[in-house]
Amino acid sequence: MDPQNKSPKPQVKSTRLVVKKQPAGVVFPKLSIPVNDFEKTVTLTRAQKKEAKLLKKAQRKANKLNNKQDSTFFNSASGETNNTILPPGVKNQADNKTNRFSKFISFFTSSKNKQPDEITERLVDDPTVKNRFSAFNKKLIWVLKDKKLRARAWKIVGYTNLVIVAFFAGLLAVMNKFITLSSVEYPAIALQLPINNALWGISIFVISIVTLPFWTMFILFLMGVKDVRTSRSIHYFIWIVLIINVVLLLVSCLLMIAAYAHLDGYNIWRNLESLNPNN
């Protein structure tokens, strides 16, 4: 066969497939190029296959992001929300579950016990504290942080409780004697028997609850709880009991004034002489 009669083989120009990365969230068509006026699929090289895998991986990540809500989180330190850049098609909506959980955790986490160096540091308003605590709570936090203010608060509590205990201990002794007096010899006291019984019961109640916070502190100390004196819960308990006792002290004074204001000095002295055990 004559070699000159051989038909020459068609020369195919070498084409190079260039795959460009597309942004996430875009569906890519099949990769194909025309060869010799025919539509044929091109066999990819190793580098091109690796690049195609990376594109598919990016596509899967974009699909996952499309099924999720906006990835925002609650910053407990500053109280602000940080938004991330989302792929197209994803709505910018707040993650309510994450925000609720973060607020729940940040509400119960206590702030660091930092000793204020200056008065101005205690007067700076913290936006997170402003939203969560009232003015009384913020004042109590400042008092517990400052050693001088904390010592002054303990002195006020101690002296007030001593006055309350002394008042109601004397009132209990007097009322315990008054409720046993004869109505014939002491008619003025016998006429006020309901008030005397009420004052007697109030005295017992106040004396029984005035030491309850301190017993609680002692039990917590034995259980190994540290810094019981600086606990906000303990101070709430102490001040609530103290306010109740002060209110009952005022009520007792009003009851005694209403019961014995009509008596003159001689009758009051005569009634008080009944406390003498020699009589």
UniProtKB/Swiss-Prot annotation:
Residue intervals passing through the bilayer: 156-176, 202-222, 237-257
Bilayer topology term: Multi-pass membrane protein
Keyword Transmembrane: yes
Organism superkingdom: Bacteria
Localization in the cell: Cell membrane
Start and end residues of each stretch annotated as Disordered: 60-92
Alphabetical keyword list: Cell membrane, Membrane, Transmembrane, Transmembrane helix
Compositionally biased tracts (Polar residues): 70-85
Protein name per UniProt: Uncharacterized protein MG144
